[in-house]
Amino acid sequence: MEHSQPNSMPQDLSEALKEATKEVHVQAENAEFMKNFQKGEVTREGFKLVMASLYHIYDALEEEIEHNKENPVYTPLYFPEELHRRAALEQDMAFWYGPRWQEAIPYTQATKRYVRRLQQVGRFEPELLVAHAYTRYMGDLSGGQVLKKIAQKALDLPSSGEGLAFFTFPNVANATKFKQLYRSRMNTLEMTPEVKQRVLEEAKTAFLLNIQLFEEVQELLTQDTKDQRPSQASDIRKRAGSRVQDSTPVTTPRGKPQLSVLSQVPLIRWVLTLSFLVATVAMGLYAM
């Protein structure tokens, strides 16, 4: 009986990932912020912040993927034409921030934490990169499509898809079939049981990075509901700003300036928008 314990883990990596992340799936599914997003409570100003955060995250992820594209621990999952989002997000940045978007986009503390982890994995633990690629791209191909429709309606965006290039995968003809292909490729990766367990733990870390963001947003939301008087608006922005500016040195993707835009947007819009960011991950991954 004691020898049956190792066999309790699903043999296929894709199934093992699904099983290992069930608990964090539930946490994300039951998050209060989901109700806000499902009601379409997203503003244009806030959505810009969401897209900027996604740009930083995918810029870091895909830079590390490029560094490891010939590494056997990742090569079978290298689908730049079908999946990579950086070019699409650059289009979205130009739409939302204008031609000088690289000088204008914000870089929040929660995003920095995510980027730091991606850089660490890509450079020192590339065998774990599959966990981040799987959770992000498969989520984008699933629940991300639902979020696109909600955002398009809530923000009254053009039906042509301007400002939403991130959600469009022109080189994926059938999302369901492609996800099946991706999972089958994942299952061909050779790894020891020890490495496999680390991959599963890293997938949980990817979820937890977003749950931490949710907790931060909830705290700011609680503070904002307690401080509604105009005379206190400056103090609220200062509290929020202290959370966005991270004193810890960090490598900025492509050397972009780390500019805060919180002073330009009402806090409540910022809070609701960050909720949208976490909702993208939570809903997208749960749909897998």
From Swiss-Prot:
Residues the UniProt record annotates as site (Important for catalytic activity): D140
Chain segments annotated as transmembrane: 266-288
EC number: 1.14.14.18
Topology Cytoplasmic: residue spans: 1-265
Keyword Translocase: no
Catalytic activity: heme b + 3 reduced [NADPH--hemoprotein reductase] + 3 O2 = biliverdin IXalpha + CO + Fe(2+) + 3 oxidized [NADPH--hemoprotein reductase] + 3 H2O + H(+)
Enzyme class: oxidoreductase
Comment on protein domains: The transmembrane domain is necessary for its oligomerization.
Keyword Transmembrane helix tagged: yes
Residue stretches of biased makeup (Polar residues): 1-11
Pfam families to which the protein is assigned, alphabetical: Heme_oxygenase
Gene: HMOX1
Its membrane topology: Single-pass type IV membrane protein
Quaternary context: Homodimer and higher order homooligomer. Oligomerization is crucial for its stability and function in the endoplasmic reticulum. Interacts with FLVCR2; this interaction is potentiated in the presence of heme.
CDD domains, alphabetized: HemeO-like (cd00232)
Protein name: Heme oxygenase 1
Family the entry assigns: Belongs to the heme oxygenase family.
